[in-house]
Every structure is written in C-alpha cells, then in structure tokens.
C-alpha cells in the first residue's frame, strides 16, 4: 500500500487514490454541518466546538457568504476552506463582471468541485481536505443546495450533512425530511436544529445557524443570534417532551 500513497497521481491496483481517501478522513474529523432546502429558504447549521478562553470567537466561522445570494459551510481543514472561499468569491465577481448576471448556485458549486478535482490530478499538490455544503438562490428565485467532496464530486440535494456526524444526521434527515417539514423558515429551522441534536450537545453555544430566504422578490440572509437559537432550542425541546408524553399515554391505552 505504501507504494501507492506516496503520490496523488498513482492508482493502487484495486483502483484507489489513497491521498484522496485520506482527505476524506480529514473531513470525517471536522465539525458537523447540515444544510436543508426549504420551500422558500435555505438553512445551514454547523457545530461549534469549544475554543481557547483567550481566542476571539469572531475569527472562527464555519459559514461563509460568497455572494449576496450564495453561502456555504464546510467540514475539514479550515485553512483549505479559506483558500477555496476566497477563490469562489473572486469567481463570483468575475462572472458578474463578464456576463452581467450573478452566478447560479450550480455554476459556483461546479467551479469549486473542478478546483478540487484539479488538485487530485496534479503532481506536487495534495487534495483539499474539506467537504462543502453550498446553498443559495438562482435568478428565478429557486433555492438550491449542493455538496462537494475532496475528490471533486458534487451533487444536488434537498438536505444533507457532512463532517464527523454525517451518518446519524443524514439518517435522521432521510426519515424526517418532507415538504410539510420544510414549508417555511420556522419548520426548516426546527428540522436543522433537530438533526444537529443527533450529534451536538444541547446549547446555543454549540450551534451556528444561517438562513437565506426570499421575501417579496428580495433575498434576505442572516446569522441567528444566540438568543434566537436558545429560543428555538426551547421550542424543539417542548415539542419533544409533548410528543413523548403523548406516546406514553397512547401506550397505556
């Protein structure tokens, strides 16, 4: 095996590119991120890990705006993400200057994926150790959500997760996602919080959430405050307790 993981451009006999697989392992050690596409909104939530007491938490951001209508979250190496975020922002500006239209979410997702793929095929480089959830709105007001992998693969989803808690969160989303649960901002927010709760300890200090939605043909985006997240967690907990009580009562009958 050691002969085949020394260079990024060498396949193993059974078809593996080990450096790409190692990059995927870096993603699996990253903070959990989840994205959900609602009827008229995109909600992205990420796990916030504890930081040193002397560190300014404003320098720790897992959710980034790359244009007025596109945002992303990532899991993996923060330094790698910073490089790709900067490249994506420049590409958004270049696209708008050239074509006089904002980028589509699919275009910028493909651009990021292509950049990642080039780093899996060039000697003297290494793959980006990050996976990204990219959400936003196209010109016609359609919400879109994409996920990119270290290999350069990218796909569109209605909901997905990445990072260390990807598997349990994705399984929860597969069970709970529906049009009814994403009919508006409030229901979509609850779904994101409940899915993160599968792997993240309760508490507003452990979660960061950003919302992008279309209101009267105008896009609005914001990051929820600690107070808003705390209130949302209380609502979710109240609903959970009520559901458990109802289930217990039905069993007694």
UniProtKB/Swiss-Prot annotation:
GO cellular component: cytoplasm; nucleus; proteasome core complex, alpha-subunit complex
First-listed, main subcellular location of the protein, grouped into a coarse class: cytoplasm
Listed Gene3D superfamilies: Glutamine Phosphoribosylpyrophosphate, subunit 1, domain 1 (3.60.20.10)
Biological process terms in GO annotation: proteasome-mediated ubiquitin-dependent protein catabolic process
Subcellular location: Cytoplasm; Nucleus
Alphabetic keyword roster: Cytoplasm, Nucleus, Proteasome
Name the record gives this protein: Proteasome subunit alpha type-7
Originating species: Caenorhabditis elegans
UniProt lineage: Eukaryota, Metazoa, Ecdysozoa, Nematoda, Chromadorea
